[in-house]
């Protein structure tokens, strides 16, 4: 593959095929292209917008060149946000994962260190003494015994390290910002994704339809890439598309300051702990319940009402099962 031919086609407003973008990733990992050409490619894609097939091809390439995580259970979910909403929320998706697991559903959480917030999923997990691993036996023990496994992105997506310096130098979002939710190395058949705007919701909706998985995509109308309860929020799934009010789930509207994750990693850790220990602010608990509930509904293939799923999530926290799940997870994965 000649990158100059790809760039010339893009200048002529041509789209790339899924196979071509897959091969681009493979070529990048083999150092076949100079940085200047990769920079031009990423800039051109960002200016015109990436197509569904192009995004899927990049995904295919990252998974093909990365380390797989083959789990010996069939049905599990990942709850993740695209990031980049610059709202610095507490670790809502990560906390929700332990609530879902505490309710008896299997979870394979894929995450990384913070990029635009104080504390990302990997920060809060590591700050509890957890050691990241790609050892498949340990990963399977975690999901089978604790009901949840954590997959630290940097151990699996080898292609990302090749483009890291270029992404940092560009100082604007690229197609790689869209790929994080799509490259979970365990390739879950269920996913709850939070996006920061409706354009992303439409894009991922088409991507998930092509992948054939069970999914829910959520966006708070005021710009959060999760259900923040600070405003109405939109949900798109395999079977419905609807705008909800917080009151529809029995929750009060939250204030923006109640969603924030604190100024330090330690403050973010304290909020995470408080939710699982059932001593958080009511708004913080409600936000996690809302996100966990839609994740549970995805796992149930939409067969349970969202009201039922909220109560399942609530019981996970109130009974102490979410906290017990987290403690078991830490015990298995301790440094």
Predicted regions and their residues:
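A generic, well-ordered mixed alpha/beta core segment in the N-terminal half of proteins
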Residues: 81, 85-142
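Glycine-rich anion-binding loops and their surrounding alpha/beta cores
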Residues: 64-69, 89, 104, 126-133, ...
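Alpha-helical scaffolding segments of alpha/beta enzyme cores, especially the outer helices
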Residues: 23, 57-60, 95-98, 165, ...
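Short loop or secondary-structure boundary microenvironments that flank
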Residues: 45, 111, 194-197
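Acidic, glycine/proline-rich low-complexity segments that act as flexible tails and inter-domain linkers
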Residues: 1-89, 103, 107, 254-259, ...
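Short amphipathic alpha-helical face segments that pack within enzyme cores
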Residues: 40, 94-99, 287, 291-294
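Short, flexible segments with low predicted structural confidence
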Residues: 13, 72, 96-97, 176-179
């Amino acid at each position: 593959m000649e990158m100059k031919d790809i760039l010339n086609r893009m200048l002529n407003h041509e789209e790339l095929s899924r196979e071509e973008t897959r091969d681009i990733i493979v070529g990048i990992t083999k150092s076949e292209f100079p940085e200047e050409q990769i920079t031009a490619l990423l800039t051109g894609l960002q200016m015109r917008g990436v197509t569904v097939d192009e995004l899927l091809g990049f995904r295919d390439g990252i998974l093909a060149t990365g380390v797989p995580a083959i789990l010996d259970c069939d049905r599990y979910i990942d709850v993740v946000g695209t990031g980049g909403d610059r709202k610095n929320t507490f670790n809502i998706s990560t906390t929700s994962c332990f609530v879902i697991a505490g309710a008896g559903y299997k979870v394979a959480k894929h995450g990384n260190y913070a990029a635009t917030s104080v504390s990302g999923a990997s920060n809060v997990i590591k700050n509890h003494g957890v050691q990241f691993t790609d050892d498949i036996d340990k990963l399977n023990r975690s999901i089978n015994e604790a009901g949840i496994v954590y997959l630290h992105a940097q151990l699996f997506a080898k292609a990302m390290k090749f483009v890291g310096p270029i992404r940092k130098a560009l100082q604007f979002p690229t197609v790689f910002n869209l790929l994080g939710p799509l490259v979970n190395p365990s390739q879950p058949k269920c996913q709850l994704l939070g996006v920061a705007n409706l354009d992303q919701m439409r894009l991922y909706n088409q991507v998930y339809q092509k992948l054939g998985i069970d999914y829910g995509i959520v966006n708070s109308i005021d710009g959060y890439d999760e259900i923040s309860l600070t405003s109405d929020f939109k949900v798109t799934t395999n079977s419905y598309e609807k705008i909800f009010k917080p009151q529809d789930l029995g929750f009060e509207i939250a204030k923006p300051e109640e969603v924030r994750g604190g100024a330090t990693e330690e403050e973010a850790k304290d909020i995470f702990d408080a939710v699982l220990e059932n001593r958080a602010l009511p708004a913080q608990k409600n936000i996690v319940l809302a996100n966990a509930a839609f994740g549970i509904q995805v796992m149930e293939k939409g067969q349970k009402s969202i009201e039922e799923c909220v109560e399942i999530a609530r019981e996970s926290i109130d009974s102490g099962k979410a906290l017990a799940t987290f403690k078991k997870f830490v015990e298995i994965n301790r440094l």
